Amino acid sequence: AVPFIPVFENDDLPGVYTAAVVQKLMNLEHALLGKNILTVGAGNIGYLTSYQLTQAGANVVAIVEAQKSEGGFPVQANRVRRLGIPILTGYTLVKAIPNDDYTAVKGAVIAQADNKFKPISGTEKLIENIELINICTGLIPDDQLLILGKEVFGNKCHGVGDAIRIGEGTSAVLRGKQAAFEVLADLDIRYDYDDYLAISKEYIDSQQHPIRVLDNPAKPTEARKNKPFVIIDCLYGFA
């Protein structure tokens, strides 16, 4: 898996780092990349790194989250609240402010986000006196090797783990077992199909998440309702 990094102005400045970099330097090298920190992403990783940074002596000025509600486990969110770290939901990072010679970060601009996570003009807020922006906005699958494998071997190349989707270790193990049966089929080796179905069911069940019901869903405007819609059929019962 590779980090997902949202696009914002000056996102390539020294001082803008992903949680993986921040944690590695802090936990393995015992080094802080900054004393005053802004965390982007109110999920488990954002909560955990903010908590660890505070324990290491840093000052996390805030955690900003573009969605209207917090992510992650409530126990993790409550832990950073007890440390006095504010969690600002409905805000997106607009800009990292560089120092005079563009060698570090000295501030950031955040703004309220609309339902497409775009900044709303006129709602900008300035956050000053920070040296580090800690990006904790999740991961995306790293499927480059899988793509190359399929180009060479076709459908006889099977993906597992984070090459397929981001999930927990249990899901990766189950997908690995499922792929093993698929390899046996490619080799024309007999196996118990009931075992394959059982593993497949476990794997699919491990992907299921409760359906989130939106109190105020984003609906199309009347003008959009009067225009044609593209209808896509779902071929599979899972994604």
Question: What residue spans do the PLM features occupy?
Answer:
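Residues forming the flavin
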Residues: 1-239
